[in-house]
Amino acid sequence: MKKQLIIGTRSSPLALWQAEFTKAELSRHFPELDITLKLVKTTGDVLLDSPLSKIGDMGLFTKDIEKHLITKEIDLAVHSLKDVPTATPDGLIITSFTEREDTRDVIISKNGVKLKDLPQNAKMATSSLRRMSQLLSLRPDLDIRDIRGNLNTRFQKFDNGEFDAMMLAYAGVFRLNFSDRISEILPHEVMLPAVGQGALGIETRVDDEQTREIVRILNHSTTEYCCRAERALLRHLQGGCQIPIGAYASFKNGTLTLLAYVGSVDGKIGLHNNITKTGLTSPEQAEAAGIELAEELLKQGADAILSQIRKTR
C-alpha cells in the first residue's frame, strides 16, 4: 500500500473544495496515508477573455493537470466531471465517480425574481451554450451575456450590477455556501444539466493499480451508471463546451432513465428525447443506452443542428 498520495487540482475556490473533500474522504478510509495537494494552473484559468465556445479546445480545465498525471508528478487528479472530455488521454482513466450533488441549474437574480418574471430583455449571464439554447427557447427576449471566472468573481460582477440575473450549477453554489443567493432552482423539465454535472471525476493512471484500488473506494455506483450513460451519449454526438447538449440520467433498482436535449444556439430548434432501460447489471449497459439515445437524436435531426453549429463556432 502506498504511504503518500499527491492530488492535482486547479486553484479556484470550487476546485480546492473538491480536492479537499476528496482528501478528507480518502483520509477517513486510509488514515495512514500522507495526502498533499498540488495546484495546477490550466488553460481555462488563464484564457478568461473569450467565451468557452470560441476557444474551441477540449479539456481546457483538465489537460494541464493530466500532463502532471502522465509524468507522475501527481497520483490522481480531481475534476468537475462536466469539465472532463469524454475521451481521456492514453494511459489515463476516470477511476471513481463520486456521489452526485443536486444536478439542477439555478437562477441568481435581483430581488429573487424568477426566470418567467424577469423583465423584458433582461441581461442574463451564462458561459454555457447549453443554457443559452434552453433559455432562449423559453425566453427569446433575453439578452444573453457571456461570463467567465470563478464563482466568487461571478457573484462580484453580478453584485456590481453588470447583469440582471445569472445561471449557475446548484452544486457549485451549494458547495461554496452561496445557497442563500438562489432565486430559483430550475427543474429538469425546464433546463437539462450538463453531462456529469454535480459529480466529481477522479482520474488516475491506468497502470497505477495501487492508487486505483485506493481511489475506487470513493466510487458511487449509481452515479457511475448515470454519468457513463450521459458521457456515452455526448461522446457519440461528438459534443463538448461548444455544443448545446443537455442530459440527465437516473438509475434505481436496475432501471436507467436518460433524458437528453440538443438545440440550436438561438433556441429556435430544440430536440428532446429519452430512453428507459431495465435490468441493467453493468455500467457498460448504461453506456449502450446512452449511445442508443444518441442515435435516436441523430435520426431526429441532431446531426444537422450540430453540423451547423460547428461551422459557425
UniProtKB/Swiss-Prot annotation:
Tetrapolymerization of the monopyrrole PBG into the hydroxymethylbilane pre-uroporphyrinogen in several discrete steps. PANTHER family: PORPHOBILINOGEN DEAMINASE. Binds 1 dipyrromethane group covalently. This is Porphobilinogen deaminase. Pathway: Porphyrin-containing compound metabolism; protoporphyrin-IX biosynthesis; coproporphyrinogen-III from 5-aminolevulinate: step 2/4; Porphyrin-containing compound metabolism; chlorophyll biosynthesis. The gene is hemC. NCBIfam families: hemC. The keyword Transport does not apply. GO terms for biological process: chlorophyll biosynthetic process; protoporphyrinogen IX biosynthetic process. GO terms for molecular function: hydroxymethylbilane synthase activity. Belongs to the HMBS family. Its EC number is 2.5.1.61. Keywords: Chlorophyll biosynthesis, Porphyrin biosynthesis, Transferase. The porphobilinogen subunits are added to the dipyrromethane group. GO terms for cellular component: cytoplasm. The modification S-(dipyrrolylmethanemethyl)cysteine is found at C241. It catalyses: 4 porphobilinogen + H2O = hydroxymethylbilane + 4 NH4(+). CDD domains: PBP2_EcHMBS_like (cd13646). Its cofactor is dipyrromethane. Monomer. It is an enzyme of class 2 (transferase).
